[in-house]
From Swiss-Prot:
The protein's name in its UniProt record: Probable ATP-dependent RNA helicase spindle-E
Reactions catalysed according to its record: ATP + H2O = ADP + phosphate + H(+)
Entries under PANTHER family matching the protein: ATP-DEPENDENT RNA HELICASE, ATP-DEPENDENT RNA HELICASE TDRD9
Residue intervals of the Helicase ATP-binding domain: 125-292
Pfam families with a match to the protein in the record: DEAD, HA2_C, Helicase_C, TUDOR
Keyword Ribonucleoprotein among record annotations: no
Classification via CDD domains: SF2_C_RHA
Domain Tudor: residue ranges: 936-999
Any one GO CC term of the record: nucleus
Length: 1432
């Protein structure tokens, strides 16, 4: 590299000061709530196919010289001589003799004469000899696929002429099975004369192959690489009617090469339902048209078709179907069931008139019902089940058939039904051609289908319901009549079928992404993509081509320019684009693989890409199976909140099973247990192997040096999420922001003050039902989620219809090893509970009406009834005995007795030391230790007893039996007064004497639980929001030193948030300095309690002692954990009323919104199969936005609801989303506030036209408003990262290999790793929200000097221009300080507050409560530091 490159990031150089851009204007909080211009999606310009005519006319001039359809010219040259485009090559070459080959293998010229195709053999061969292109139309089963290539090779054998035939198949399995079948028929060794190739896998020993069966993509890639057809003498394109995108592009290439350098290669097009007129016109020239040969045959059994209007006695209740609104109608299901009843009655009546009995007819009288999707299949099955209950005589066996069915279900499709039952197969269009069931005699066809349609402007796809084509319907009708005559019932009128239904379906090229075709056009290098795609059989719209090219520029496959000049409809191929053409993946998945190579996680990236490419990895099941499947998948996610990480982890498990040679049965059992399709997993495994092979061929290898290996799972988890964020930009979604100052308050109000991280609620329970009687029944509702009843408390609120269920944090620390890991502070049980509702919204329980309930409690003396009002029994509470800190205690001294983590440790106040010592001496007296435990069965869960701790016995409570050995039973116990847990053998346990029980049984613990305040684990150094080991060790060291002084921040639910004081400062701050923690807000309840404590402590000197005691007792009563009465419910026979509870709900259920303009104002939901389908605000105390990245996005038919698939929740690192956008976007404008003192928003995308100021790709422009401080140095670090990524792939002109050697690549990788660590480990200050109508407007930045571009126009990731920030104006700072003083002056006001504005944080404060809590927020405290304010 030259000196400019080496010194590019030398920060010692002087930077030129320039004027910053006129960016966003800060708005007040009220302004944030108004709709802005940016929320409106951009208008899309829809350009049609007008461009096609000019290009097609020009192409025709090239075809004029070729006589397609005329006689073949005399062959007097060899194939090797016709690679030139010279007119002299017009004459056909003489094919060389191949005597040696034919003498090497056995050739039997006797073909199967029973096949219908044989009668047309001579006509077919004559047409092939005399024409360049031949179209062959023959029904399925006529023999065209296997026989026509053999006819050609037989004729070549007879003439001893060289021939080389390639036959394309749309599916891998077809190519393999047909090749093997032909080899078997001809008695050739597999892979010799006849061979196959799928992907890069070619049958071994195929050097002599003269007949190759391959997938469409194999031939297409071969022709693109060689740019000639002359490697083959005959090209047979089978199943051309399917019109997938690869086939349509292959037709373009074949026709172009026929017209240029391959004029004497023979092309045969074959299909069962081909639109011969369309193909004839496509290959026609002035010299003639290709001949069409029909090789169809008659049916063995008759087929009768019925239409809706011909079924007069069905009494249809609906209007005519609407051509523009496909659907089954409200009575579609019942109409189909009527037909089933008619079929059954008809066969019963004709039993005596035919030779077949009714039972025999049932065996061959299966019914195939074509439905558009899985939901419709489920609805139809439910409707049939309902009718069967009403008509016991109708006995049917229902089989579901769709692309995601399990292998067992596939076998059921072909199996005979039980004796006396009729088989009914409910199927999607998969049974049109892929599955043939011989015993089907009836088809009920709703004439509907679902097709995947992609909007190229947004790159969002949707599964749309459409009317099936007539071709589809003919294929469906062909499924009947294999064993006897058949009937087809089409559920549309005949006139509708004839007039409104299309003859053929819409080709894939007109409804699917064009990225692959555009990249292939670039690789073919025969003109711009627009000129190639205009030659398609069905050319796409110009707007679709334009959007596709813009998308390819966005992902780095194309440069924005051609030869250095910007071209909207073209771009030079980048190294990334060249690699993408060689990977059998979607472009974003290819980008994932490329970034895996960059960050040395290639194998992981390949596995995730393969998993996303294979359909049906997860089995789709209903009911409890669906609930269980979700959690089995969640286990593999391992707390990462990532579908992609789950894929990688369960593939690793599968691979280990394969490597350890675990039996096939074990693998099948494992797959069933985790609800994974073993068939799809095997398919994924093959794709992983192919991708690894292709990457190896492309010289994409992981760096093997030890210094480049990822250190641990924590670093790998972070890098994998960075790969995902980079690969799927701009599929960025933000979990709804929480700038509403009442967010925390509202959350707690919904739950009646209970902890939202542990509580869910039901609705629709009227207060009159005396809910405390049914707590156990309510707990039983969670049995499906396997949540033990003792792990929850059920509470009610007076006058409310809600039921609150609060889950307990397990007492057993070993549960941290639980298979289900969830992120953040929320308990796993909350996720389990909310997931229950997704499967079933209503939960019934049986209750008594009020008069009967009152009578019941009075008879059984449960609680008290006062003036007709029932008061359930409650446990006594003595605040004076609690070890908890008083509301007036700011600091406490004592001992840390047990440490789980920085987020959970136990503290004994020094003031209780004497009483604890006395109690210990009393307990350990010989008299009180004489009550030995001799029977392990007498030890029950939650029993209080004495257990040995170190040298003495202490109070303990049994958690569970640890071992069941009769000789050495052990028990897991929690020491009540110390907080620790231990496994204690039975001989170290003692029962409490009656005297000890009276004295200590009801005595509250002599310690209380604590956690560190205003900090949480740093995402960069922790997994699952768990505290790093080194952080916990710092707490242990302090505890071992003896007495500890703590400052109490708050007390909520008996847990104190504290600051631990050290000689060097405060532990909380030290953890932040060492990057073990980051600063964090407290949740609403904690801040509210802190404010309450502050105000009480400020006035404590003026409060009498008695009043202080009373205030503290009430304070501790409110702060304690909820406890229910846990009463036995009334007998079921007395509970005659059924209440349908709705829920459970959590107020932390989060919504999210898209960051790109095309998705503005659209509802976003997560795929129900995703591990993130239960999306909760896992850190409700954190006011920052959190990024969610999606591998793909689908949209509803009305284009208003987006479904996120393959989602990953990014680390809760403040500013993570903005940093990822800056690293991986094509270009960005960083916008400042009006004073130019800070960056406030990003506008990322492809940029804009400097002449018109119009954005290049407005639909995909991303706007991100910053909520943390981003500095100029951060952008410089990001520019270094972008430079390093480009360096890895940079090639010198004329070179095939990158300029970076393997050794240099390791240096680049370690630099990237170091830069990432520096970027993400910063503890960023909060900034106030800014929002402006200019956020989404690209602005001219002539006053900013652009950054130097080391790679010029060849940069995939060009350098970002960095606006220069100004120092904050002193006058403005004084104004903000004055505003701050005014806010503090109103803090103690007790009246009604006039609304105030916090100018520091850009927020409107409506009440004193809002004001107080805002002043304690991390945002406000950070802003105070930034302006140098201190409250006196």
């Amino acid at each position: 590299m030259d000196e400019d490159l080496m010194g590019f990031f030398d920060f010692s150089k002087e930077f030129k000061r320039t004027e910053a851009p006129k960016g966003c204007i800060s708005s007040n909080f009220v302004g944030l709530g108004t709709e802005k211009e940016k929320t409106k999606p951009p208008k899309q310009e829809n350009l049609g196919t007008e461009y096609v005519k000019e290009i097609v006319d020009r192409e025709k001039q090239n075809l004029e010289s070729l006589g397609i359809g005329g006689s073949a010219a005399k062959r007097n040259r060899t194939l090797d001589d016709i690679d030139s485009d010279n007119e002299e090559c017009y004459e056909a070459p003489d094919l060389r003799l191949d005597e040696e080959f034919y003498s090497k293998y056995y050739f039997d010229l006797n073909r199967d004469k029973t096949l219908p195709i044989y009668t047309q053999r001579d006509q077919i061969m004559k047409a092939i000899r005399e024409n360049t292109v031949v179209i062959l139309k023959g029904e399925t089963g006529c023999g065209k696929t296997t026989q026509v290539p053999q006819y050609i090779i037989d004729e070549a054998y007879q003439n001893r002429q060289y021939c080389n035939i390639v036959v394309t198949q749309p599916r891998r399995i077809a190519a393999i099975s047909i090749a093997n079948r032909v080899s078997q028929e001809r008695h050739w060794e597999p892979g010799t004369v006849c061979s196959y190739q799928v992907g890069l896998h070619r049958q071994s020993g195929s050097e002599d192959a003269r007949l190759l069966y391959c997938t469409t993509g194999v031939l297409l890639n071969f022709l693109i690489n060689h740019k000639t057809l002359t490697h083959y003498t005959h090209i047979v394109l089978d199943e051309v009617h399917e019109r997938d995108q690869e086939m349509d592009f292959l037709l373009i290439v074949v026709r172009r090469l026929l017209a240029t350098n391959s004029r004497h290669v023979k092309v045969i097009l074959m299909s069962a339902t081909i639109d011969s007129r369309e193909f004839v016109q496509y290959f026609a020239t002035k010299n003639g048209i290709p001949p069409v040969i029909n090789a169809s045959h008659g049916r063995k059994y008759p087929l009768v078709k019925f239409y809706r209007d011909q079924l007069k006695n069905m009494q249809w209740q609906e209007d005519q179907p609407n051509p523009d609104e496909p659907g089954m109608g409200s009575h579609g299901y019942s109409a189909a069931i009527k037909i089933l009843l008619v079929i059954d009655n008809m066969e019963r009546r004709t039993e005596g008139q035919s030779q077949r009995s009714y039972e025999e007819n049932l065996k061959t009288g299966s019914v195939l019902i074509f439905l558009p999707g899985i939901n419709e299949i489920d609805n139809m099955a439910e409707s049939i089940d309902h009718v069967m209950q009403e008509n016991p005589a109708l006995k049917v066996s229902i089989i579901r058939c769709h692309s995601l069915m399990t292998p067992d279900s596939q076998r059921d499709v072909f199996a005979s039904p039980p004796v006396g039952y009729r088989k009914i197969i409910l199927t999607t269009n998969i049974a049109e051609s892929s599955i043939t069931v011989p015993d089907v005699s009836y088809v009920i066809d709703f004439c509907l289908a679902k097709v995947l349609v992609t909007d190229t402007a947004t790159n969002f796809s949707s599964l749309r319901l459409v009317w099936a084509s007539k071709s589809n319907c003919r294929q469906r009708a062909g499924r009947v009549g294999r064993l006897r005559s058949g009937r087809v019932y089409r559920m549309v009128p005949k006139s509708f079928y004839m007039k409104h239904m299309l003859e053929f379906g819409v080709p894939e090229m007109l409804r699917s992404p064009l990225e692959s075709s555009v990249l292939k056009a670039k690789e073919l290098n025969m003109g711009p993509p627009i000129e190639m795609l205009a030659l398609a059989l069905s050319p796409p719209k110009l707007s679709d081509i334009r959007n596709t090219i813009l998308l390819l520029k966005e992902v780095g496959a194309l440069y924005p320019t051609v030869d250095g000049n910007y071209v909207e409809l073209d771009g030079d191929l980048t190294p990334w684009g060249s690699i993408m053409t060689r990977l059998p993946l979607d472009i974003r998945l290819s980008r994932l693989v490329l970034l895996g190579y960059v960050f040395n996680c290639l194998d992981e990236a390949i596995v995730m890409a393969a998993g996303l490419s294979v359909r049906g990895l997860y089995l789709q099941e209903a009911g409890f199976q669906s609930y269980e499947a979700y959690w089995m998948h969640y286990v593999f996610a391992d707390g990462s909140s990532s579908d992609l990480v789950a894929i990688w982890r369960f593939y690793k498990t599968y691979l280990n099973m394969c490597e350890n040679r675990i039996m096939q049965e074990s693998a099948a059992q494992w797959a069933r247990r985790y609800h994974i399709s073993l068939r799809s997993l095997k398919e994924m495994h093959l794709l992983v192997q192919e991708l690894q092979y292709r990457c190896n061929k492309l010289r994409l290898h992981p760096v093997q040096l030890q210094s480049c290996q990822i250190k641990d799972d924590r670093e790998r988890a972070l890098i994998l999420k960075i790969l995902i964020a980079g690969a799927f930009y701009p599929n960025y979604f933000i979990r709804s922001n929480k700038f509403n100052p009442d967010y925390g308050r509202n959350t707690y109000q919904v739950l009646g003050g209970y902890d939202p991280c542990r509580t869910v609620y039901f609705t629709h329970f009227e207060p009159r039902y005396m809910g405390e009687l049914y707590t156990r029944r309510i707990k039983d509702l969670f049995s499906e989620a396997k949540i033990p009843p003792e792990n929850m408390d059920v509470n009610f609120q007076v006058g409310s219809e809600k039921i609150f269920v609060t889950f307990k944090q397990t007492e057993d620390e070993m549960d941290q090893l639980n298979l289900i890991q969830v992120p953040g502070r929320i308990l796993t049980d909350v996720y389990k509970a909310v997931r229950l509702r997704i499967g079933k919204q209503y939960r019934p329980i049986r209750v008594m009406e009020l008069p009967h309930a009152i009578q019941y409690v009075q008879e059984n003396k449960i609680g008290t009834v006062i003036e007709g009002q029932w008061h359930p029994p409650s446990k006594p509470f003595n605040a004076g005995l609690m070890a908890l800190p008083s509301v007036y205690d700011k600091n406490m001294i004592g001992y840390i007795t047990h440490i789980v983590s920085c987020g959970k440790f136990f503290f004994q106040p020094l003031e209780l030391a004497d009483s604890i010592t006395n109690m210990s001496e009393h307990i350990n007296s010989p008299k009180n230790l004489s009550h030995y435990v001799v029977d392990a069965g007498s030890i029950t869960k939650n029993l209080k007893l004495l257990a040995k701790r170190v040298d003495d016995f202490q109070r303990a409570q049994v958690i569970r039996v640890e071992t069941h050995s009769h000789q050495y039973p052990k028990f897991r116990v929690r020491f009540i007064d110390y907080g620790d847990i231990a496994v204690v053998p039975m001989d170290q346990l003692r029962f409490m004497s009656n005297q000890l029980k009276r004295e200590y049984d009801d005595l509250p613990p002599r310690c209380f639980e604590c956690r560190l305040a205003l900090v949480q684990p740093a995402a960069l150094t922790s997994n699952y929001n768990r505290w790093p080991i080194k952080a916990n060790e710092m707490v242990r060291k302090i505890a071992m030193d003896g007495r500890v002084e703590m400052e109490i921040y708050s007390l909520v639910n008996n847990v104190a948030a504290v600051f631990i004081k050290m000689r060097e400062g405060v532990l909380n701050d030290k953890l932040v300095e060492k990057n073990y923690a980051r600063r964090s807000d407290e949740d609403f309840a904690s801040i509210q309690d802190h404010d309450f404590r502050l105000r009480k402590q400020e006035r404590s000197f003026h409060v009498p002692r008695a009043e202080r005691k009373q205030v503290n007792e009430e304070y501790l009563r409110v702060s304690r954990l909820p406890q229910d009465a846990d009463l036995s419910p009334p007998p079921m026979h007395k509970c005659q009323t059924v209440v349908r509870l709705k829920g459970p709900y959590s107020p932390l259920e989060a919504s999210m919104f898209s960051t790109i303009r095309a998705s503005a104002c659209k509802t976003v939901r997560i795929d129900p199969l995703s591990v993130n389908s239960v999306l909760l605000d896992s850190n409700p105390q954190d006011r920052h936005d959190q990024l969610i990245v999606s591998a793909s996005v689908t949209t509803s038919n009305n284009n208003q609801v987006l479904t996120v698939r393959g989602s990953t929740v990014m680390p809760n690192t403040h500013g993570f989303g903005a940093l990822m956008a800056l690293i991986f976007c094509p270009t960005v404008q960083i916008k400042c506030n009006k004073e130019c003192t800070k960056f406030v928003s990003l506008l990322a995308g492809l940029g804009y036209n400097p002449e018109t100021m119009e954005p290049y790709y407005e639909d995909h422009d991303v706007v991100m408003n910053l909520d943390v401080n981003l500095l100029e140095d951060d952008v410089r670090l990001i520019n270094q990262m972008r430079y390093n990524i480009d360096t890895i792939f940079f090639k010198y002109e004329g070179e095939d290999a990158p300029a970076v050697s393997e050794g240099d690549r390791s240096i680049v990788f370690n630099q990237l790793r170091c830069l990432l660590s520096r970027l993400l480990s910063k503890d960023r200050c909060y900034i106030e929200p800014h929002s402006s109508n200019l956020d989404n407007v690209w602005e001219k930045l002539d006053n900013l000097e652009p950054q130097s571009e080391p790679y010029g126009k060849r940069a995939i990731f060009p350098m970002h221009t960095i606006p220069e920030l100004q120092n904050e104006d002193t006058t403005a700072r004084l104004v903000l300080q004055e505003n701050c003083k005014r806010l503090y002056s109103w803090r103690t006001f007790d009246g009604v507050l006039q609304p105030l504005d916090c100018k520091l944080c850009n927020q409107r404060l409506e009440t004193v409560s809002q004001l107080r809590l805002h002043l304690l927020s991390q945002l406000h405290r950070d802003r105070e530091k930034q302006i140098g304010f201190q409250d006196n």
